[in-house]
Amino acid sequence: TMSSFDDKAATWDDEAKIERARAVADAIAGAVPLEPSMRLFEYGAGTGLVAEQLASRVGPITLADPSAGMREVASEKVAAGSLPPTTRVWGTDLATDGVPEDRFELIVTVMTLHHIADLPPVLAAFAEMLTDEGRLCIVDLEAEDGSFHAGSGHDAGVGHAHDGFEPDQLAARLADAGFTTSVERSIHQVTKDGRAYPLFLAVSVKQP
């Protein structure tokens, strides 16, 4: 539930998550020509770990996360200088809040979409928020058997909607939203309870 993310926020940034953020940022940098002018929107940004890793390679950063606890940690990082002073921290929930007016050259969402039961409105919002040449980068679990979130209270209503994604199926959902997508598998392994779970990177551009 959302409150469980609030509770976890203060101790969220452990070594494994920092390493994951670094691997994700490097995979994105390898797949997308990053520019210091690019406006970055990270959805489900948590404490801003991925944005921290990308900050020196992109322009102004906007972080969105529905968890107040996560936003508080992200805002503390801005105050402390680990994220640029111009960084904005939003509580926007694209599934319910409507689409922001702002436009972005780069939208990143990491380990977030598997929490979203109703993807089409969120993918449509991404399409609207992205500039014509912009890139949407999705990093998530490759389809798994449900064990990744077993016992984390994720099944209770909010939270866990998908046991990861078959990247091809996600690409089809993205096509419905007007995107062309290329997928890179196994950009990083997340280890949990002694098992390794691969992450994929999907990079999408809007169809002209």
Protein language model features and the residues they cover:
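Class I SAM-dependent methyltransferase SAM/SAH-binding core
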Residues: 41-97
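Residues lining the SAM
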Residues: 64, 110-113, 139
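C-terminal alpha-helical "lid/dimerization" subdomain adjacent to the S-adenosyl-L-methionine
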Residues: 13-19, 135-203
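A short acidic, Gly/Pro-enriched loop at the edge of an enzyme's catalytic core
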Residues: 95-107
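Conserved class I S-adenosyl-L-methionine
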Residues: 1-36, 50, 73, 80-81, ...
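A short glycine-rich, Lys/Arg-flanked "PGG" loop and its adjoining helix->strand segment in the class I
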Residues: 120-132
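Short glycine-centered segments of the SAM/dcSAM-binding site in methyltransferase folds
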Residues: 39, 60, 133-135
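A short SAM/SAH-binding and catalytic strip from SAM-dependent methyltransferases
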Residues: 105-118
